Amino acid sequence: MVGVDVGREYVRAAVADLTGKIVAQRRQAARARSARTLITTIGSVARAAAESAGIGWRRVTVAAVGSPGVFGSAGHPLLAHNLPGWTREGVLDEIRRELATSVVFENDVNLAALGERWRGLGREVDDFVYFHVGTGVGLGIVIGGELFKGANGAAGEVAYLPLATADPHDKANRRRGALETAIGADGVLSAARHTGVRGATTAAEVFEAARGGDGKARHAVALVAEGIALGIAAIVPVLDPALVILGGGIGRNADLLREPLERELRALSPFRPRIEVSSLGEEAELMGAVSLALDAAQDRLFSRLDAGRGVAV
């Protein structure tokens, strides 16, 4: 089976056998300007991974594809503003035709939570959340050892919490979410401008400057950390997780975020969940995709075995 992680800047694929052993991986830049181009890249990267594993594509029984967006009953992703054309009708059917195998879809942050449950910090924890803070913001929720998606697949879309410094009534913020506007990649740059940081054009450069001792950059990072703490303070009383796993390109900067984040959380909330940085790093989503594909493949296999024994399935 194949797991595929689709991001704004890359497409990654991993091939695994039925034991879950990863036998090949491939990655390709994907600065696509259209959904059609991105779908073609998904197909080429997935097939390249299978070829690297030494198997023909016809032997791939299931592909799990993860990307930003809500995968509910609409037949196409919703709220996937970071990928061009991704919310239009027919996108999922086009991916199925491109891959020409059984395909399951899931939100990328949900996949990261599954990855942590399978091979990361969530292996021994039944109730935890994966808080992704990067270009976008989202939450993967595991309750009782199972992924929780809600009635319409939108559980964890915390980007739309009307929190932090962004005005939730602003039309631009309603499109991408007030919390994402405040603490996502653009929020880091906004905080940097507010504190007087000069020359930084990416969130990574702001963190690099802070790590190098730039006081204004450290102030900007502290503002972002306080916004993350506000998000956690809103989440914890509702879900009561034993563990909050921070992930994403911003969330993984624990050396800079932890002290102001925990200080602000102490000021905001009486609840003290354990907070850790993802042990899987940027591999979390891909491992989750493989885990989802593995579950789907095993379900198909056992259904066929039961059907062969005359068991109703």
Question: Where are each of the predicted segments found?
Answer:
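ATP-binding/phosphotransfer module of carbohydrate and carboxylate kinases, centering on a glycine-rich
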Residues: 1-59, 99-101, 119, 165-313
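Phosphate-binding/catalytic loop of phosphoryl-transfer enzymes
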Residues: 4, 18, 59-177, 293-313
